Amino acid sequence: MNLNKIVAGDDIPNDIYVIIEISSNSSPIKYEVDKKSGMLFVDRFIPTPMFYPCNYGYINHTLSLDGDPLDVLVPSHYPIKSSCVIHCKPIGILNMQDESGDDAKIIAVPKSKICQEYKNINDISDISELLKKQITHFFQNYKTLEKEKWVEIIGWGNCQDAKLEINDAYNRAKKNSIFLNK
């Protein structure tokens, strides 16, 4: 499976393809796709007994400030299998830092063709406060039992902030020729 052939989106930053690494509500295991082989690897077992509140993945052909592709959380009623690709629209961003530096998380919902329920969700203000609190709580606490690891939540940003981050990460990857097929 060569996930490197998956484009970042049809209309960056308004339209993105998210490669799922971790299903929502799954066991506390951090998976990462190896960008060269496309295979899913176990990164680590998370000692804090928590589950991911949303499907967790990344946008291919992007480079975030931590040196990895840009992370994305995709809320849905159903867990999406690891290594699946889902067509999404960005609605917001959770800005945070960890022991490696800036570590933004884009929040994106499935395109309405996939699920009509998200048709009118266009900004982070359109999702429930409870879901935002669950996401914040997860990231504030999931590393607490790991030595020398920490997370600081900076705050939420809106759809425009998310699109700016996506553009920056896409252009950064392009400039550095990282994750791009030639």
Curated annotation (Swiss-Prot):
What are the subcellular locations of this protein? Cytoplasm
Q: Report any one BP term from Gene Ontology.
A: phosphate-containing compound metabolic process
A GO molecular function annotation here is: magnesium ion binding
Its recorded reaction(s) are: diphosphate + H2O = 2 phosphate + H(+)
Q: Does the keyword Cytoplasm apply?
A: yes
Q: Which residues lie in coiled coils?
A: none
- CDD domains, per the entry: pyrophosphatase
| UniProt keyword list | Cytoplasm, Hydrolase, Magnesium, Metal-binding
Q: Does the keyword field hold Cell membrane? A: no
Could you tell me the EC number(s) of this protein? 3.6.1.1
EC category name: hydrolase
In terms of superkingdom, the source organism counts as Bacteria
Q: Which residues take part in binding substrate?
A: K30, R44, Y56, Y142
> What positions does the entry give for Mg(2+) 2 binding?
D71
The entry's family comment says:
Belongs to the PPase family.
> By its UniProt entry, which PANTHER family does this protein fall under?
INORGANIC PYROPHOSPHATASE (PTHR10286)
Q: What is this protein called?
A: Inorganic pyrophosphatase
What organism is recorded for this protein?
Buchnera aphidicola subsp. Acyrthosiphon pisum (strain APS) (Acyrthosiphon pisum symbiotic bacterium)
**Lineage of this protein's species?**
Bacteria, Pseudomonadati, Pseudomonadota, Gammaproteobacteria, Enterobacterales
Gene (name only) = ppa
